[in-house]
Amino acid sequence: MIEAFLLGIILGLIPITLIGLFVTAYLQYRRGDQLDF
């Protein structure tokens, strides 16, 4: 029961973590573009 609960939390956190990484990478990329100007 506890293992299934932890598995659900992990599966829920993985997409959030990936989205956070993509957002930070995108913001750094745009910031670099602005600095190039």
Swiss-Prot record:
Belongs to the PetG family. This is Cytochrome b6-f complex subunit 5. GO terms for molecular function: electron transporter, transferring electrons within cytochrome b6/f complex of photosystem II activity. The keyword ATP-binding does not apply. The 4 large subunits of the cytochrome b6-f complex are cytochrome b6, subunit IV (17 kDa polypeptide, PetD), cytochrome f and the Rieske protein, while the 4 small subunits are PetG, PetL, PetM and PetN. The complex functions as a dimer. It is a single-pass membrane protein. Component of the cytochrome b6-f complex, which mediates electron transfer between photosystem II (PSII) and photosystem I (PSI), cyclic electron flow around PSI, and state transitions. PetG is required for either the stability or assembly of the cytochrome b6-f complex. GO terms for cellular component: cytochrome b6f complex; plastid membrane; thylakoid membrane. The lineage of its organism: Eukaryota, Viridiplantae, Streptophyta, Embryophyta, Tracheophyta. It comes from Cuscuta gronovii (Common dodder). The gene is petG.
